[in-house]
Amino acid sequence: MALRVDYEGSNDVGVFCTLTNSYCLVGVGGTQNFYSILEAELSDLIPVVHTSIASTRIVGRLTVGNRHGLLVPNATTDQELQHLRNSLPDEVAIRRVDERLSALGNVIACNDHVAIVHAEISAETEQALVEVLKVEVFRVSLAQNSLVGSYCILSSNGCLVAARTPPETQREIAALLQIPVVAGTCNRGSELIGAGMVVNDWVAFCGLDSTSTELSVVESIFKLGEQGAPTSISNQLRDTLIESML
């Protein structure tokens, strides 16, 4: 299911929110409306955590995570880090990384198995992705768009890239990630897909301006609504299958 929401009048819900299969982070804000919508959809399945990162609300652009772990920038305070450790499930590892490209959500897009990253991220950050998020890492750019986290979003079921991404680049990414890739937009034509929406394996939240056509593309590529929330058993089966293939 894909839902339209806004964060205090902003359509850029991916700027203020990080959504994975095991937790959801939401930037602290003045209104409860956005938070309450996410709570209503997610709280039976995963924790929805109100937090700031580096004393800002733009948690979606500063963090990157999946069901295995969460990476936060070096500017994250000790209090914020402790709050996250107390709020997230025990099996979710958290690490603070010293990365020059500190808006991690702009330069990294990942699911539970693979990550595509900006060509210039440090070797230490790449190592943290492997160790904490347990993903295979590929350095790519989407034609002229090196900020892969802003112009691309992926789940375990599919990947949505900016509309002007060349077909050969789409095919290359599909071959690397081993999931379907389609080009599209959100928020009535915006190519900043990572900033305009968040998605996990069973639900997506898109900006309020997103058209019904854009929502149908999102539901199709991410296979939303075809099944309920994945169980821990299905996750373990997929992990076992991938380990046996490596």
Swiss-Prot record:
Compartments, record wording: Cytoplasm; Nucleus, Nucleolus
Recite the UniProt keywords alphabetically.
Cytoplasm, Initiation factor, Nucleus, Protein biosynthesis, Ribosome biogenesis
Pfam families, from UniProt?
A: eIF-6
Q: Name one GO biological process term.
A: maturation of LSU-rRNA
Q: Which GO terms describe its cellular component?
A: cytosol; nucleolus; nucleus
Where's it mainly located? cytoplasm
GO molecular-function terms, A-Z = ribosomal large subunit binding; translation initiation factor activity
Q: Does the keyword Kinase apply?
A: no
- Keyword flag Nucleus: yes
Entries under InterPro entries matching the protein:
eIF6 (IPR002769)
| Subunit field text | Monomer. Associates with the 60S ribosomal subunit.
Q: What does this protein do, in the record's words?
A: Binds to the 60S ribosomal subunit and prevents its association with the 40S ribosomal subunit to form the 80S initiation complex in the cytoplasm. May also be involved in ribosome biogenesis. Involved in miRNA-mediated gene silencing.
Question: Which protein family is named in the record?
Answer: Belongs to the eIF-6 family.
Q: This chain belongs to which protein, by name?
A: Eukaryotic translation initiation factor 6
Which lineage?
Eukaryota, Metazoa, Ecdysozoa, Nematoda, Chromadorea
